[in-house]
Amino acid sequence: GMGGGKAFAGGGKKEKRAVGSNFGYRKEMPDGMKILGEEYRTDRNGETYPLWKIGEMKSPAGEDLLVVSIPNLTDKNDYESWKGFIETFDRAYLENKDKWEKGRIILDVRGNGGGEDKPIDHVAKRLYGNLVNTYKRCEIKDTAVSNAFLHCHGAYKPRNYERDGLTAEKLVKRKNFSGEDRVLFDETAVYYPFNDKGGYHGRIDVLIDRGVGSSAESAYTSFYHHPNVRYVGENTAGMQQYTQGSFAMPCGYLMRVGVTKLTYWDKEGENIEVKGHKPDVDCRGKDAFEAVLQMPRDEGRILGFREKNEPVKGREVFT
């Protein structure tokens, strides 16, 4: 939490709000859980951590559950890095679609601070049967300083321009800046509708907590338009974007600086930065996975479709 007794996510009073750690970190699996696939990575300190885990089991009420745990998003955002996850999920889901339509899919991203969004994006598109709506929009104040920050973080990084066959001398640098706000990209203009024929009509439970930030928050935004989704846990961090650069300060700390305003929109049409996303079922004090196992199938669930985030400005597009 921040100072003054305030907690970071949601700005409420500092209080115990744990909803359990991600399923991927569990040492002991629930009775009857069959693991279909999992991958681990090793950090620079030699510690092993889970990247993803997919398994199936039955709930106490006898429902078939497909459990998809993504505790970390540390790999690159390409197919090769997530091939094991994609193939395991597709095999489990596509070969038993009817079974899961009658049952439930549980997506656990608790504690995931972000990185890349490939596996979440894959599951979201597969279950939607179309591209998904994230309502992402990014602006920058067009000044020399903010552009320098942005490009040093991206296009001016040697590893990025060298990959395109460029050298430092070939980079073109702008001299004139408007000083006004400029939109870098805007994904709010096109609405992708749910694919009634190819999409998933069963139940989805997404487990979230205060540790969910940056691209892991796309587990909220990417599933917002799916039917029959229930978010369970606690408020997310509301940190869609961290920063564009960092400086070492004399005291030894790093100061991180952001120059762009990246916004995602929630159902009220407000930017969720700092505010975060609220769950449908707040289960603070209980493990969210245990809570959804015990909870009636549709308790607190929005059945069918939620209201669209914003009025559909553009055209509906099937891909």
What are the language-model segments listed below?
Residues 1-140, 151-156, 203, 218, ...:
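Flexible, low-complexity junctional segments that flank or bridge functional domains
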Residues 117-290:
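Conserved acidic, small-residue-rich alpha-beta core segments centered on
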Residues 293-294:
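Juxtamembrane/interface motifs at transmembrane-helix termini
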